[in-house]
C-alpha cells in the first residue's frame, strides 16, 4: 500500500495503465530483505540443520505472500475496472477531434479558395500578357508604318528640292540669256544709228560736189566743141585738170550711183581750190567702205545672235520639258500608290498562293502578271511602297524565260528542213550555228540548275524540265535529227562534186561532215542508226586514198 500511495501524483488513467503493464511485464519485486523473487541461489550453508534460521525464513515467506496479495489485489481491481476508467476519461477527447476536423476542413476550404484565387490571377495574368504582346505588335507595326511614311516624306522632300533647284537654274539661265540679248539689241541699235548718219551725210555730199563744179567751170577756159575735133584717146588722170575731172564726174554721177574706187595719188596740185576738192573725195569712200563692212558684220552678228537665240530657246524648252515630265511622272506614281493599293495587294496574294503543275502554267501566270503590272506608271517605284514578293516574282519570271527559250530552240531544231535551193555553204553554216546554240543553252541550263534549283523547289516551281530527262533530252534528240540532215546534205554535195571531179571539195565536205557528226556524238552521247547510215553513205563516196582514215573515224563514232 505504501508503494501505491507514493505514485498517486500521476493521473489515474495513466497510473492504471502503467500498473497493468508493470504487473505483466516487470519481474517479481525485491523483498524487504533485498532478495529478488525467483529461483533461490544455492549456498554452501545448509539451512535445514539450523532450526532458528529456518523459522525466520518461513515467517518472512508468509509476510512476503501477504504483502504481495495486498499489492496485487487493488491492481487486479483496477485492471478489471479499466474499461470504466477509459470510458470516463475518453469522452472529453471527442470534442477535441471534432474541432481538429473543423479546423482541417476550414484550412482545406481556405486553401481551395487560395488556389482558386491563384488560378484566377494566373488566367488574368495570361490574358494581360497576351494583350501586352498584341499591343507590342501593334506598336511595332505602327513604328514600321511611321518609318515608311518618313522615308516617303524624305524622298518627296528630296524630289521637291531637286525640282526647286532645277527651276532656279532654269530661271538663272533664262535671266542670263535675256541679259545677253539686251547688249546685242543695244549694239544693233547703235549700228542702225550709225548707218542712218552715214546715209544722211552721203545725201549731203552731192550738193557740195555740184557747188564745187560750178565754181571750177567759171574759172576754167571754154573747151572746143566735140564736133570739130576728132575723138582723142582719154588722157591720163594725172594730166587732166582737177576742174574738168570734177565737171565730168558731176555730169555722169547721180545721187544714187555707187562711188568709184579712189584714184592713185596725184602730183601736188597747183591750186588750193583743187586741193580742197580732192581732199573732200576720200571721206565718202572710206565711209562707204566702213558702212559696207559694218553691214557685213551686222549680218554675221545677227546670224550668230539668231543661232544663239535658237540654241538658248531649245535648251530652255528642253529643261522646262524635262521638269514637267519629271513632275508628271512623280504625280502618276503617287496616284498609283494611293488608288491602286487593293489591286497590288491582290497581286501579292496571287503571287504567294498560286501553285503550278507544269511550266506551261508558270508561263501563262508570268504573262498575265506582266500585263497587270504594265498598267502602273512605274512598276519598281510603285511596288517598293508595298510588301511585294520580289524574290519569288523574279524567280518565276526567270524560270518562264529560260523554259520559253529552251522550248523555242527545241522547236527550231526539230522543225528544221534543208532547202536544196540554198547554197550548201550557207545551209551547213546555219546548221552548225544551231548546234552551237544548243550547246550554249544546255551549259547555261546546267549552271542554272546548280544555282537555282533549291529556290525553285522552295517557291513550288516545277523542276522536272531542268533534269536530264526533261528539255535536255529533247534538245539532244533534235540535234541528232539535225546531224542526219547535215549528213544527207553533205552526201548530196559529194555526189555533185564527183560529177565535177573536184578532189579538194570532196575532202573539205568530208571533213565538215565528220566534224559535225563527232560534235553531235559528243553532245548527244551517241547517234541513231539513221545518222550512222548517212555517215556510212558519205564514207562510200569518199576517194579510195581517204576511205581508210575516214572509215576508222566513222567506226569510232559508231
Swiss-Prot record:
It comes from Arabidopsis thaliana (Mouse-ear cress). Keywords: Coiled coil, Cytoplasm, Cytoskeleton. The keyword Transmembrane does not apply. It is found in: Cytoplasm, Cytoskeleton. It comes from the Eukaryota. GO terms for molecular function: microtubule binding. Residues 1-54, 207-285 are annotated as: Disordered. GO terms for cellular component: cortical microtubule. Residues 221-236, 256-272 have a biased composition (Pro residues). Its main location: cytoplasm. Microtubule-associated protein probably involved in the regulation of microtubule organization. Residues 104-180, 392-448 form a coiled coil. SUPFAM superfamilies: Formin homology 2 domain (FH2 domain). The keyword Cytoplasm applies. Belongs to the IPGA1 family. Residues 1-15 have a biased composition (Low complexity). This is INCREASED PETAL GROWTH ANISOTROPY 1-like protein 2. InterPro entries: CHUP1/IPGA1-like.
Amino acid at each position: 500500500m505504501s508503494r501505491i500511495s507514493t505514485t498517486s501524483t500521476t493521473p489515474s488513467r495513466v497510473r492504471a495503465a502503467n500498473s497493468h503493464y508493470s504487473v505483466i511485464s516487470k519481474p517479481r519485486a525485491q523483498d524487504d530483505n533485498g532478495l529478488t523473487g525467483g529461483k533461490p541461489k544455492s549456498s554452501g550453508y545448509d539451512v535445514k540443520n539450523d532450526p532458528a534460521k529456518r523459522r525466520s525464513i518461513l515467517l518472512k515467506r508468509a509476510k512476503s505472500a501477504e504483502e504481495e496479495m495486498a499489492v496485487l489485489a487493488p491492481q487486479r481491481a483496477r485492471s478489471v475496472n479499466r474499461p470504466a476508467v477509459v470510458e470516463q476519461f475518453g469522452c472529453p477527447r471527442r470534442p477535441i477531434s471534432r474541432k481538429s476536423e473543423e479546423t482541417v476542413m476550414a484550412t482545406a476550404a481556405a486553401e481551395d479558395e487560395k488556389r482558386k484565387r491563384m488560378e484566377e490571377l494566373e488566367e488574368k495574368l495570361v490574358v494581360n500578357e497576351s494583350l501586352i504582346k498584341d499591343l507590342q505588335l501593334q506598336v511595332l507595326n505602327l513604328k514600321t508604318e511611321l518609318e515608311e511614311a518618313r522615308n516617303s516624306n524624305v524622298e518627296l522632300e528630296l524630289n521637291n528640292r531637286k525640282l526647286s533647284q532645277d527651276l532656279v537654274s532654269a530661271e538663272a539661265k533664262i535671266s542670263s540669256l535675256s541679259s545677253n540679248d539686251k547688249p546685242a539689241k543695244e549694239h544693233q541699235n547703235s549700228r542702225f544709228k550709225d548707218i542712218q548718219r552715214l546715209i544722211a551725210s552721203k545725201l549731203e555730199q552731192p550738193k557740195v560736189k555740184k557747188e564745187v563744179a560750178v565754181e571750177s567751170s567759171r574759172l576754167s577756159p571754154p573747151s572746143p566743141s566735140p564736133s570739130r575735133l576728132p575723138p582723142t584717146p582719154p588722157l591720163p588722170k594725172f594730166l587732166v585738170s582737177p576742174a574738168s575731172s570734177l565737171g565730168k564726174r558731176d555730169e555722169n554721177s547721180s545721187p544714187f550711183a555707187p562711188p568709184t574706187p579712189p584714184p592713185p595719188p596725184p602730183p601736188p596740185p597747183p591750186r588750193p581750190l583743187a586741193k580742197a576738192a580732192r581732199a573732200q573725195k576720200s571721206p565718202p569712200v572710206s565711209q562707204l567702205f566702213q558702212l559696207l563692212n559694218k553691214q557685213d558684220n551686222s549680218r554675221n552678228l545677227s546670224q550668230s545672235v539668231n543661232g544663239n537665240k535658237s540654241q538658248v530657246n531649245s535648251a530652255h524648252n528642253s529643261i522646262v520639258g524635262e521638269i514637267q515630265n519629271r513632275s508628271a511622272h512623280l504625280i502618276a506614281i503617287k496616284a498609283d500608290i494611293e488608288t491602286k493599293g487593293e489591286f497590288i495587294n491582290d497581286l501579292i496574294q496571287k503571287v504567294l498562293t498560286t501553285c503550278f503543275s507544269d511550266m506551261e502554267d508558270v508561263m501563262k501566270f508570268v504573262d498575265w502578271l506582266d500585263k497587270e503590272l504594265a498598267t502602273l506608271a512605274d512598276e519598281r517605284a510603285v511596288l517598293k511602297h508595298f510588301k511585294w514578293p520580289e524574290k519569288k516574282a523574279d524567280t518565276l519570271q526567270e524560270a518562264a524565260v529560260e523554259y520559253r527559250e529552251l522550248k523555242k530552240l527545241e522547236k527550231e531544231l526539230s522543225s528544221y528542213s534543208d532547202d536544196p535551193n540554198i547554197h550548201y555553204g550557207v545551209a551547213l553554216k546555219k546548221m552548225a550555228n544551231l548546234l552551237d546554240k544548243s550547246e550554249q543553252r544546255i551549259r547555261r541550263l546546267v549552271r542554272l540548275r546548280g544555282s537555282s534549283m533549291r529556290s525553285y523547289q522552295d517557291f513550288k516551281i516545277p523542276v522536272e524540265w531542268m533534269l536530264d530527262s526533261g528539255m535536255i533530252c529533247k534538245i539532244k534528240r533534235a540535234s541528232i535529227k539535225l546531224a542526219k540532215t547535215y549528213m544527207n546534205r553533205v552526201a548530196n554535195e559529194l555526189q555533185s562534186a564527183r560529177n565535177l571531179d573536184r578532189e579538194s571539195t570532196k575532202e573539205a565536205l568530208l571533213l565538215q561532215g565528220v566534224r559535225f557528226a563527232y560534235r553531235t556524238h559528243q553532245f548527244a552521247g551517241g547517234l541513231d542508226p539513221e545518222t550512222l547510215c548517212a555517215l556510212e553513205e558519205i564514207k562510200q563516196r569518199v576517194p579510195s586514198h581517204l576511205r581508210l582514215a575516214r572509215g576508222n573515224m566513222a567506226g569510232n563514232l559508231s
